[in-house]
Regions:
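Residue(s) in the substrate-gating loop at a strand-loop-helix junction
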Residues: 136
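Conserved glycine-rich Rossmann-like NAD(P)H-binding loop of the short-chain dehydrogenase/reductase
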Residues: 24-38
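Conserved glycine-rich cofactor-binding loop
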Residues: 3, 10-12
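Active-site helix of classical SDR
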Residues: 115, 152, 160
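Alpha-helical segment proximal to the catalytic Tyr-Lys
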Residues: 120, 165-169
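Substrate-binding pocket helix/loop in short-chain dehydrogenase/reductase
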Residues: 91-92, 96-104, 196, 200
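Active-site loop-to-helix junction immediately N-terminal to the catalytic Tyr of the SDR YXXXK motif
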Residues: 90, 95, 141-150, 162, ...
Length: 204
């Protein structure tokens, strides 16, 4: 009977996490920049409900209303998965302010303000809650040619620890997952680069 809010669940990891939560018995609130048609189909096929909300999370003003809508629909929320993210690739010497801001606004700024809004609901509900943030192995390794992505995912690790420290007294668990390279839309350009793809595969 739990309700999980999952951002960026149209494809890839986010879609997989939404389906996994649905298989575990959760109803899903999906927040995406496009309608996640295939995810909705698969979640509802499992007998779970799916509330689809469309938003550009780089604009944080609308975040409280999104979670208010989720609570209005289901009566409560229990889990937040902050998965929505993007990546821009360019040498650090040539990296633009727009590519910096777009990535930072979605990958770290929205993570904090989504978590803040969810935590307020968790506290008001009195039952605690779970927040799962998606970091990256680049939070630790740095990587190359993705300066704003690396900065944002390093920030995700930092604020995850901070929120866990502050909100433990409210029975809110805050954790981060740091995946390696996965076959998703975000890594399509990387996998298409034969040299970089070979370098990564050689590590296995």
């Amino acid at each position: 009977g739990k309700v999980a809010v999952v951002t960026g669940c149209d494809t890839g990891l986010g879609q997989g996490m939404a389906l996994g939560l649905a298989q575990a018995g959760c109803d899903i609130v999906g927040i995406n920049i496009v309608e996640p048609t295939e995810t909705i189909k698969q979640v509802t096929a499992l007998g779970r409900r799916f509330l689809s909300l469309t938003a550009d999370l780089r604009k944080i003003d609308g975040i409280p209303a999104l979670l208010d809508r989720a609570v209005a629909e289901f009566g409560h929320i229990d889990i937040l998965v902050n998965n929505a993210g993007l990546i821009r690739r360019e040498d650090a010497l040539e990296f633009s302010e727009k590519d910096w801001d777009d990535v930072m606004n979605l990958n770290i700024k929205s993570v904090f303000f989504m978590s803040q809004a969810a935590a307020k609901h968790f506290i008001a509900q009195g039952n605690g809650g779970k927040i799962i943030n998606i970091a990256s192995m680049l939070s630790f390794q740095g990587g190359i040619r993705v300066p704003s992505y690396t900065a944002s995912k390093s920030g995700v690790m930092g604020v995850t620890r901070l929120m866990a420290n502050e909100w433990a007294k409210h029975n809110i668990n805050v954790n981060a997952i740091a995946p390696g390279y996965m076959a998703t839309n975000n890594t399509q350009q990387l996998r298409a680069d034969e040299q970089r793809s070979a370098e990564l595969l050689d590590r296995i």
